[in-house]
From Swiss-Prot:
One of its GO terms (biological process) is epidermal growth factor receptor signaling pathway. It comes from Macaca mulatta (Rhesus macaque). PANTHER family: PROTRANSFORMING GROWTH FACTOR ALPHA, TRANSFORMING GROWTH FACTOR ALPHA. The gene is TGFA. Gene3D superfamilies: Laminin. This is Protransforming growth factor alpha. Glycans are attached at residue 3. Keywords: Cell membrane, Disulfide bond, EGF-like domain, Glycoprotein, Growth factor, Membrane, Mitogen, Secreted, Signal, Transmembrane, Transmembrane helix. Hypothalamus. Disulfide bonds join 24-37, 32-48, 50-59. SUPFAM superfamilies: EGF/Laminin. TGF alpha is a mitogenic polypeptide that is able to bind to the EGF receptor/EGFR and to act synergistically with TGF beta to promote anchorage-independent cell proliferation in soft agar. Residues 2-16, 67-121 form a propeptide. The keyword Nucleotidyltransferase does not apply. GO terms for molecular function: epidermal growth factor receptor binding; growth factor activity.
Length: 121
């Protein structure tokens, strides 16, 4: 009984540790459509590690959930950029018109647009 417990408590031998994966042979370089080929040693067959957004045994299917999530994020960023540009344009136009009214009183079109409340001199 002592021998069996000592066998269980000994650390595993480093030489017995073998990787489960190897690089795929040249004959399988195109095995995965959207991923990296890895060779399963114990099963003696290739397998794929898919890139983000793809699923399937050979990474042949687009992951629609990943595509939708990425699309929604892009839409939110695009909307934020468009709103920021429009707000900046409105701010610049407002500043130009105020400057025109304050500094250049002789500008007729400016007075007609903004300075209606002022009494003519």
């Amino acid at each position: 009984l002592e021998n069996s417990t000592s066998l269980l408590s000994d650390p595993p031998v480093a030489a017995a540790v073998v990787s489960h994966f190897n690089d795929c042979p040249d004959s399988h370089t195109q095995f995965c459509f959207h991923g990296t080929c890895r060779f399963l040693v114990q099963e003696d067959r290739p397998a794929c590690v898919c890139h983000s957004g793809y699923v399937g045994a050979r990474c042949e299917h687009a992951d629609l959930l990943a595509v939708v999530a990425a699309s929604q994020k892009k839409q939110a960023i695009t909307a934020l950029v468009v709103v920021s540009i429009v707000a900046l344009a409105v701010l610049i136009i407002t500043c130009v018109l105020i400057h025109c009214c304050q500094v250049r009183k002789h500008c007729e079109w400016c007075r007609a647009l903004i300075c209606r409340h002022e009494k003519p001199s």
